[in-house]
UniProtKB/Swiss-Prot annotation:
Name this protein carries in UniProt: Small ribosomal subunit protein uS8
Assigned protein family: Belongs to the universal ribosomal protein uS8 family.
Source lineage: Bacteria, Pseudomonadati, Pseudomonadota, Gammaproteobacteria, Moraxellales
Record SUPFAM superfamilies: Ribosomal protein S8 (SSF56047)
Role, per record: One of the primary rRNA binding proteins, it binds directly to 16S rRNA central domain where it helps coordinate assembly of the platform of the 30S subunit.
MF (Gene Ontology): rRNA binding; structural constituent of ribosome
One Pfam family cited in the UniProt record for this chain: Ribosomal_S8
UniProt feature coiled coil, ranges: none
GO CC entries: ribonucleoprotein complex; ribosome
Quaternary structure note: Part of the 30S ribosomal subunit. Contacts proteins S5 and S12.
Alphabetical list of Gene3D superfamilies matching this protein: 3.30.1370.30, 3.30.1490.10
Gene that encodes it: rpsH
Keyword Transferase: no
Native source species: Acinetobacter baylyi (strain ATCC 33305 / BD413 / ADP1)
Length: 131
């Protein structure tokens, strides 16, 4: 059985690992997952992104962050999904928690935050909300 929505699986693994107070979480790697993980690291939601290559398959390992025993990521929600893609123009990119969270957007210039997409003046597919 093949996995249908790998990004939703990634976000669920991160959410479950943080609820279980794990330090790291591992998953199968892809270019999209690595790009999303790099955005999360740049924004300070996770501490480290590591890709390990074992023969034919690559594994993505994320080091999670906690502040005073609580996970740094409060909520993570998949927005655009395989059954209902969510595309937004440059003027319609949503703001998460009035700017306290981020929206991860897939644009023609790559994966970036909502703020970076607005600054670049480009829209795209809204992948997820993180706060």
């Amino acid at each position: 059985m093949s996995m249908q929505d790998t990004v939703a699986d990634m976000l669920t693994r991160v959410r479950n690992a943080q609820m279980a107070k794990k330090q790291t979480v591992s998953m199968p790697s892809s270019k999209l997952k690595v790009a999303i993980a790099n955005v999360l690291q740049q924004e300070g939601y996770i501490s480290n992104v590591e890709v390990a290559q074992e023969e034919a398959k690559a594994t993505l390992t994320l080091t999670l962050k906690y502040f005073e025993g609580k996970p740094v990521i409060e909520t993570v929600k998949r927005v655009s999904r395989p059954g209902l893609r969510q595309y937004r123009g440059k003027d319609k990119i949503p703001s998460v928690k009035q700017g306290l969270g981020i929206a991860i957007v897939s644009t023609s210039k790559g994966i970036m935050t909502d703020r970076a997409a607005r600054a670049a003046g480009i829209g795209g597919e809204v992948i997820a909300f993180v706060s």
